[in-house]
Regions:
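Flexible, glycine- and charge-enriched loops at secondary-structure boundaries
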Residues: 17, 76, 111-118, 166, ...
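Short helix/loop segment immediately N-terminal to the Walker
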Residues: 33-39, 145-155, 271-276
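Short, glycine/charged-enriched secondary-structure capping and boundary segments
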Residues: 22-23, 59-62, 112-115, 151-159
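Phosphate-binding/switch region of NTP-binding enzymes
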Residues: 7-8, 13, 17-18, 45-47, ...
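Conserved inter-motif catalytic segment of the P-loop NTP-binding fold
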Residues: 38-127
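Walker A/P-loop NTP-binding active-site region of P-loop NTPases
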Residues: 1-67
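C-terminal regions of RecA-like/P-loop NTPase motor modules
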Residues: 91-94, 131-132, 185-296
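Conserved NTP-handling cores and scaffolds of large molecular machines
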Residues: 12, 27, 31, 51, ...
Length: 296
């Protein structure tokens, strides 16, 4: 979202930097991310201090990145005193998307992310985003406890409470995502989850998880199974839209769940009425509409 800050948090070695580079490639060329998600072509700036230029170059070669080099710039050394310089660069170069990797390395030289100073840095970034219209995506780490496994050895799913450091950090972002390795496919390919934890922008449903497949050879990601969950998301959005229109156009009439279910189900004239919508899905989306109404 333009003029806002989003954060992606994950354990070390999960692939945050690779995901950033893959998004950068898609945005600078205007190509769909994962060959599925539309992007807006624009200038991108990456502030990278979580890995060296040499290591990054090796990763780019392995990923076979093909960005539009005229639309991407990098910064490999950073100090919080460079905030004003960053703002001027964004304006001068018409940068619309800025990646920062990672928050702890960029703003936590002292190693203490639990102070109010972390909140000050978030305030400063938000100020730059608001003044320039640039969208920021900041990579961050999870607390060390996140590495612990449950008794059944299943990976722990990130929550906002797992974000490392002060609550001021999470409070200062508009949207937040948690990323983790969910397991492996039958062929040993690593599988990842990307969960929408903070939804102030309302991009998709809160706590929705994209399913990503990873390639150990290329270190690239792709949407896994039913377009990474996009097919189910599209179906749910379609149900929600139909319910909203039906209720709005029939106000103040009252409907039962069964009546709403029948009304939005597909009709096949040659074989009678056939439902393509599970009634449980209707109930779930109705609860979502009630929650949305309560928030407004």
């Amino acid at each position: 979202m333009s003029g806002t800050i989003s954060m992606i948090a994950a354990d070390s070695g999960t692939g945050k930097s690779s995901l950033i580079y893959q998004i950068m490639e898609a945005v600078t060329t205007g190509q769909p991310l994962f060959n599925q998600l539309p992007t807006k072509k624009c200038n991108v700036h990456i502030i990278q201090v979580d890995e060296s230029f040499i290591n990054a170059r090796k990763k780019w070669k392995r990923m076979q990145l093909r960005p539009d080099e005229s639309k991407v710039s990098f910064c490999w050394e950073w100090s919080p005193t460079q905030m004003e310089e960053l703002e001027n660069k964004i304006i001068d170069k018409n940068i619309q998307l800025c990646f920062m990797d990672s928050f702890g390395k960029l703003f936590g030289d002292s190693g203490d992310m639990n102070t109010i100073e972390a909140g000050y840095y978030m305030y400063s970034l938000n100020n730059i985003a608001a003044k320039t219209g640039c969208a920021f995506v900041v990579a961050h780490h999870l607390k060390k406890e996140q590495n612990k496994q449950k008794k059944d050895n299943s990976p722990r799913i990130p929550s906002l409470n797992d974000f490392f450091g002060s609550g001021y950090i999470v409070a200062g972002v508009r949207d937040a995502w948690g990323m983790w390795q969910k397991g492996e496919d039958t062929d040993g390919t690593p599988l990842y989850g990307l969960k929408y934890l903070k939804d102030n922008s309302g991009l998709i449903e809160k706590n929705w998880t994209f399913n990503l497949g990873g390639c150990e050879e290329s270190q690239r990601f792709h949407l896994f199974g039913n377009k990474g969950g996009m097919e189910e998301l599209d179906e749910r959005m379609n149900i929600k839209s139909k319910l909203h229109i039906l209720l709005k156009t029939n106000t103040p009439r009252w409907f039962s769940v069964e009546e709403l279910h029948d009304a939005i189900s597909t009709k096949k004239t040659f074989s009678g009425a056939t439902s393509t919508v599970d009634i449980r899905s209707v109930k779930r989306e109705l609860l979502g509409l009630v929650d949305d109404a309560a928030k407004t």
